[in-house]
Amino acid sequence: MKNVDFVVEESDRILLIEVKDPSDPRTTETARQSFVQNLKSKQFVNVTLVPKCRDSYTYLHLMADDRKPLVYIVILSLYEHTDRPDLFVGLQERLKLRLRKEGKKKWERQFVQDAVVLNISMWNRRFSYQADRRIS
């Protein structure tokens, strides 16, 4: 099973949070560029992001911990000084579509209420009560 990085239970929903951090100062420029290329491909959504969300949901469901709506949040530590980085355009919609239909038929049950892709500054504006910052 592949699981998301964090599961946060709020009063009215459960946040499934996946963090991708190619802006880490320890990341080489080659690795960063490779990540950006991968981000543009179907592979990133289909093989990296969706299985983590689905598997995390499956675990919560089997443990009877899925009684609240689920929101999948992907935090990409890229281009922190823009509100809507070019690379994010379309990524969120591709993610939502794939979460609803992985095969030929749509899932009969939608297991995620919403999915959003944010950078850290966008996260901090939207979730100011749980601000995020780099510590290393």
Positions of PLM-derived features:
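Context-gated lysine
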Residues: 2, 20, 40-42, 52, ...
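Short, low-complexity, polybasic intrinsically disordered segments
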Residues: 70-127
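Basic, amphipathic N-terminal segments that precede the first structured/catalytic domain
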Residues: 1-11, 129-136
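Flexible, glycine-rich phosphate/dinucleotide-binding loops
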Residues: 15, 25, 81
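General secondary-structure propensity
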Residues: 41-45, 121, 129
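Conserved catalytic cores of phosphodiester-cleaving nucleases, focusing on short active-site segments
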Residues: 6-8, 15-21
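Catalytic cores of nucleic-acid endonucleases
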Residues: 22-77
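Structural motif
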Residues: 13-15, 71
